[in-house]
UniProtKB/Swiss-Prot annotation:
Keywords: Cytoplasm, Cytoskeleton, GTP-binding, Magnesium, Metal-binding, Microtubule, Nucleotide-binding. Dimer of alpha and beta chains. A typical microtubule is a hollow water-filled tube with an outer diameter of 25 nm and an inner diameter of 15 nM. Alpha-beta heterodimers associate head-to-tail to form protofilaments running lengthwise along the microtubule wall with the beta-tubulin subunit facing the microtubule plus end conferring a structural polarity. Microtubules usually have 13 protofilaments but different protofilament numbers can be found in some organisms and specialized cells. GO terms for biological process: microtubule-based process. Mg(2+) binds at E69. Tubulin is the major constituent of microtubules, a cylinder consisting of laterally associated linear protofilaments composed of alpha- and beta-tubulin heterodimers. Microtubules grow by the addition of GTP-tubulin dimers to the microtubule end, where a stabilizing cap forms. Below the cap, tubulin dimers are in GDP-bound state, owing to GTPase activity of alpha-tubulin. The gene is TUBB1. This is Tubulin beta-1 chain. Pfam families: Tubulin (PF00091), Tubulin_C (PF03953). It comes from Anemia phyllitidis. Residues 424-443 are annotated as: Disordered. It is found in: Cytoplasm, Cytoskeleton. GO terms for cellular component: cytoplasm; microtubule. Its main location: cytoplasm. The keyword GTP-binding applies.
Amino acid sequence: MREILHVQGGQCGNQIGAKFWEVVCTEHGIDPTGTYRGDSETQLERVNVYYNEASCGRYVPRAVLMDLEPGTMDSVRSGHYGQIFRPDNFVFGQSGAGNNWAKGXYTEGAELIDSVLAVVRKEAENCDCLQGFQVCHSLGGGTGSGMGTLLISKIREEYPDRMMMTFSVFASPKVSDTVVEPYNATLSVHQLVENADECMVLDNEALYDIXLRTLKLVTPTFGDLNHLISATMSGVTCCLRFPGQLNSDLRKLAVNLIPFPRLHFFMVGFAPLTSRGSQQYXSLTVPELTQQMWDAKNMMCAADPRHGRYLTASAMFRGKMSTKEVDEQMINVQNKNSSYFVEWIPNNVKSSVCDIPPVGLKMAVTFIGNSTSIQEMFRRVSDQFTAMFRRKAFLHWYTGEGMDEMEFTEAESNMNDLVSEYQQYQDATAEREGEYEEDYDEA
C-alpha cells in the first residue's frame, strides 16, 4: 500500500506532529496503546498509509521524531498518545540549536543527522511501496528550520523519486519568538524551493486571527492553533486513508497544483471552522462549505488571496455528499470570481471527495491553493531580512558556526527571485504567454 513516512523536527514540529497523530488515531479508531477500538471496516482498510502493524496487533505510527534537545520529546512521550510511538524513533541531542539555523544545519544538527537517517531508512525499508515523506517543522527556530531542511536535502539525495511534502510554519509578523526569525526563514526557504515538492504554508498570525475572529476564543493558545493545523493535515491526506469517489495522492496533488516547479508553496484552509469545545453547526450544506472555504479569513497564512490570482487550487471534501453538487459549486465559484483565477490554465480547480468525514462533523472540506498572493509573505520576510542583513546584525552567531556571508546573499536573492516569479505569473495573460517562454530560455 502507498505508505507515507512522517518526520517531525524541532519544538514546533513535534507539537504539531503530536496533535496530528491524535487526530489520525481518533479517525482510525486507534487508542493510545495502539489497539484498534473502531467500529467500521473502512478505518482499517488503508490504515497502513500511516501505521505499521506490530506482531501483537498493535498499530504503531510510521513517525520519526527528532530534536536537538530532549524537552519537547519528553512532553510528547508523556502526552496522551505518547506511548504509541516506537521508542527507537525518538532521536534527540542535548545541546539545543538556540534558534540558530547554522547550528541546526551545520554543527549540532549535522552530528545528529546520521542517526535520524538511519531510523528513516529503517522505516522506509519496511514499506511496501513508499509514496513519500511528510515533514512538520517551523522555519523560525534553529532545529526545525536548519536541521529540518538538512534532513529534507539528505532524504532527497537518497530517495530522489519520492514525494516530499512539508508542513512549514512560517515566521509571522506580529507573533515572533526570536529576533533572528527572518534569517532562519530565508535560509530555509532557499532550501525548500530546491528540495521540497509541496509546502503547505502555515503561519501563527493567521492562525491566531482565525482563533480570535472565527472561533471567538478570547486567548488562543498554541494548543488551539495546533488543533487547526492538525485538522488541515488530516484533511490533506484523507483521500489516501479512506475510500472515496475521487481520490488523490501526494503525486496527483502535485501534478494538479504545481504549474512551475519552483512555485510549490500552498496556502491551506479548512471549513467548517468550529472551536474545540463546541460543534455548534449541526449540519452544513455543500454551498456553505464552499463559501467558507474560499473566504480569505479562512487561510492559514498571512497573505490575502484577493491581492493575487490563483494559479491552481484543490478542494478535498469529506462526508456523504453528491459529487455533482461539489462540481457545480466549484464551477460556480470560478465563474463568479473569474478575475481571481489565471485564465491561461483552464480547469485549474480540482476537487476530490472522500466518504468519511472527520470525527464529530457531518461534512468538511480542506482547501489547498497555489496563489500568487503568497509572495506577500515572502516579501515581508525578505524586508525584515534585508533590514538586519544590511547592518550585518546578529551575523556573528552564524559565521561563528562556519557559515559564509555569501550563503545569506544567495538565500536572499533566491527568495527575491521567487517573489518576482509569482509576480510575473500574476501579471501574465493568455495572449502574452509566448513572450515569457522566450524570457525563460534566456534566463
